[in-house]
Amino acid sequence: AGVLAEWNGKEWKVVRRNQFVEVTGPGGIYGNTNPETDPIWATGWDYKSVILGVRDAEKGWAFYRLPKASHSYDGAHGWNTEWPRIRNVGTNDNPDYLMTMHGMFWRFPKTFSADQTVGIRPRSAYLKVIGDFTRWNDKLVFGCDDSAHKEFLNKRTVKGDIEGPGQSNSNLWFTDVDKPDKLGSTTAIGAVWIDDLVKSGEVSEPFLFAGWE
């Protein structure tokens, strides 16, 4: 249940069939300053890893893989595609882009493009469902859905007879701007191929290793 597609003004083109979430760019919700040339970013995932796509105006789409801090967001349905974001939580003079994806806070470079892919780094892990976030009065504000009364499709055998909470719990979380660097371990896992047929000489999509000791 998911797809990345683009519209050329006349028809839709399917770019990739995976769960995708955020589609944005350096301009965020306000739009890119130079929409004809600025990159477009897209985040998604499959069972192997987080997927990060970038669209260049001339080269088209390129894709990269990042490890997952958690598999709790792997559901093959639409609910987990609502939340992760890339937002500028810095200032106009000092932009600071924060990405949330699969339980990890990521430092995301404003300059990320098909020709300049350096700078993505894990910051810390979290155990929340973060809907969106922004900077406010030198604080970070997160809109969180920490637990849901509805279990949706979470009826796996491993869960046993554990029921959902008596009521949903959603609220705003006000915290310091450096909090994304101070939470859980950045331990993560991922792969480029799992049970795939790989041809001789075939090159995988690039996988992020930088940022871990």
Please give the residue ranges for each predicted region.
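Ankyrin-repeat and related helical/solenoid repeat scaffolds used for protein-protein interactions
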Residues: Y97-D146
